[in-house]
Regions:
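Small/polar glycine-rich anion-binding or flexible loop at a beta-alpha turn
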Residues: 128-134
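Mid-to-C-terminal alpha-helical segments outside catalytic/metal-binding sites
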Residues: 114-122, 135-176
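Catalytic pocket-lining loop regions of alpha/beta-barrel enzymes
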Residues: 16-125
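Glycine-rich phosphate-binding "P-loop"
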Residues: 1-13, 133
């Protein structure tokens, strides 16, 4: 076990009001807090996340609605959290917010590329398989292809897929 997940959109999960006491309990173990939330809620939650004594992983690029682009207040909050050096963002599940849809989720590209430029060392990728909350399941190969579209080179892809998870989860270093 490496972290504790808060899912602010599903009943029965850890509640956000428990964030600080749970973070204090997991800190001695070197664990992180992982958050899935309704994206615009990040504006109000960001100061609390920034003050936590543990790393924070934000699921699904924050689930921030695409309207408003990279200027949307919640996305600006996400970038500020990344600048703090204790936040990680998963480049995952663009289907939660995309209006353009598969296979390339083009309306999510500007945000993903902005995250890659801002902090490639703080990004993770995940397929979100088995995609529990969507009726029309995406093609996981297409989702992985979007990562190649959002990044500039193979070194950045390796960083996101291999090096960053090694750093966050404490896995043994992968061979080059």
């Amino acid at each position: 076990m490496r972290g504790v997940r808060f899912h602010d959109m599903v009943a029965g999960c850890l509640r956000i009001d428990l964030l600080e006491p749970v973070a204090a309990r997991i800190r001695p173990h070197g664990w992180h807090v992982q958050i899935q939330l309704d994206g615009d809620g990040l504006v109000d939650l960001a100061p609390r996340l920034a003050a936590l004594p543990v790393d924070v992983v934000i699921d699904h690029m924050g689930r921030i609605p695409v309207a408003g682009g990279i200027e949307r207040a919640a996305f600006v909050s996400l970038l500020r959290l990344l600048e703090g050096g204790r936040c990680w963002v998963k480049l995952s599940a663009p289907y939660h917010v995309s209006r353009a849809g598969p296979p390339d989720y083009r309306d999510c590209a500007a945000r993903a590329r902005t995250l890659v430029r801002a902090a490639p060392e703080r990004l993770l990728w995940g397929s979100n398989w088995p995609h529990p909350s969507v009726r029309d399941k995406p093609d996981d190969a297409d989702l992985l292809d979007t990562l190649a579209d959002w990044t500039d080179d193979e070194a950045t892809i390796r960083r996101i897929l291999v090096d960053n998870p090694v750093a966050l989860f404490g896995f043994p270093a992968a061979p080059s």
